[in-house]
A protein has these predicted regions:
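ATP-binding N-lobe of GHMP and related small-molecule kinases
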Residues: 1-84, 98, 106-108, 284-286, ...
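Solvent-exposed alpha-helices and their adjacent loops that cap or buttress functional pockets
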Residues: 12-13, 21-24, 66-67, 120-121, ...
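DPxDG-like acidic metal-binding loop motif
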Residues: 26, 86-110, 131-136
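Short beta-strand-to-turn element immediately C-terminal to the catalytic PLP-Schiff-base lysine
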Residues: 33, 130-132, 136-141, 253-257, ...
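Phosphate-handling active-site elements
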Residues: 35, 63-73, 100-116, 143-147, ...
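Alpha/beta catalytic cores of group-transfer enzymes, especially the acyltransferase/condensing modules
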Residues: 108-157, 243-245, 249
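Anionic-ligand binding region
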Residues: 136, 140-149, 167-199, 208
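Glycine-rich, charge-dense phosphate/pyrophosphate-binding loop(s)
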Residues: 200-293
């Protein structure tokens, strides 16, 4: 039996639409073992079948290596909610691929994991930091493999994470984003992406806040999150330096380097928004891990 632990991820980091993402200290845990028939536990019954994304990713990885599919027993225990902008699908994809490698004896480095996960998921945004840990800037050159640039994130930073009780599906969130932008907007974004990566590395809150001024997606996606304005005001008035939408939402993530401020905000947010889950997270630096039981 093997156990695979995969971190949640926060994509975009405000300014880096479809480019930047970060692994965070919220996790999904998966166990796998060979079995006589496919069984999946720990998730709603509607997902306990061969269409489960974990098993689909498992089978796709086997096919990529020329291996036949075989039945397994999978148990899923997760703290990463679905359709909240925390990379829940990426945790499933990464776990399935890693399990396929482990149960067939394939030695696969992390670059290969990213490549296969990108093929399954369709883009490297979330799977790359889920595998590599840290913050990642990713892009896929024409007719080439995905390029993933990993950055360290200062361990001083705390991310106050507010998870509303409602979903925002990526497909819906993409519909509200303009398909074309002016050149001036592209220039605005590019400099700030560089500023964000540097600010995260150094823990420079002023730089992070200055860089976090997106003009591509947040002005439109915030309308899909009823609690956006109220949560934002509470966080900024309570001492957080800045706040962004995690992925396509509905999760919101505020940033500070002061643990007292983080704890104060967690209490205040839980009081004001009792239906939301509120966590104080850090950047996960290790990425997905496997344990042989």
């Amino acid at each position: 039996m093997i156990k695979i632990t995969v971190p949640a991820t926060s994509a975009n980091l405000g300014i880096g639409y479809d480019t930047l993402a970060m692994a965070v200290s919220l996790y999904s845990h998966f166990t796998f073992e060979r079995a006589d028939k496919l069984t999946i536990t720990g998730c709603p019954e509607e997902f306990q079948n061969e269409n489960n994304l974990v098993y689909v990713s498992f089978v796709d990885a086997l096919a990529a290596w020329g291996e036949p599919a075989f039945p397994v027993a999978i148990d899923i225990q997760t703290d990463v909610p679905v359709a909240r902008g925390l990379g829940s699908s990426s945790t499933c994809v990464v776990a399935g691929i890693m399990a396929a490698a482990a149960l067939t004896g394939h030695t696969v480095d992390r670059a290969e994991l990213v490549r296969i996960a990108t093929e399954v998921e369709g883009h490297p945004d979330n799977v790359a930091p889920a595998i590599l840990g840290g913050a990642v800037c990713s892009f896929t050159p024409t007719d080439s493999l995905p390029q993933c640039l990993r950055y360290e994130v200062s361990d001083r930073l705390r991310f106050i994470t507010v998870i509303p009780p409602y979903e925002v599906h990526t497909s819906e969130a993409r519909k509200v984003v303009p398909q074309e932008i002016p050149l001036s907007t592209a220039v605005w974004q590019m400099g700030r992406i560089a500023g964000m990566t540097r600010g995260l590395e150094t823990g420079d809150l002023d730089l992070i806040a200055a860089a976090n001024d997106d003009r591509i997606q947040e002005p439109y996606r915030r309308r899909l999150i009823p609690d956006y304005n109220a949560v934002r005001d509470t966080c900024l008035n309570g001492g957080a330096k800045t706040i962004w939408i995690s992925g396509s939402g509905s999760t919101l993530m505020a940033v500070t380097d002061d643990t007292i401020v983080a704890k104060f905000l967690q209490v205040k947010l839980r009081e004001q928004f009792p239906k939301c889950d509120t966590h104080i997270l850090t950047c996960d630096t290790e990425g997905a891990q496997i344990e042989y039981l």
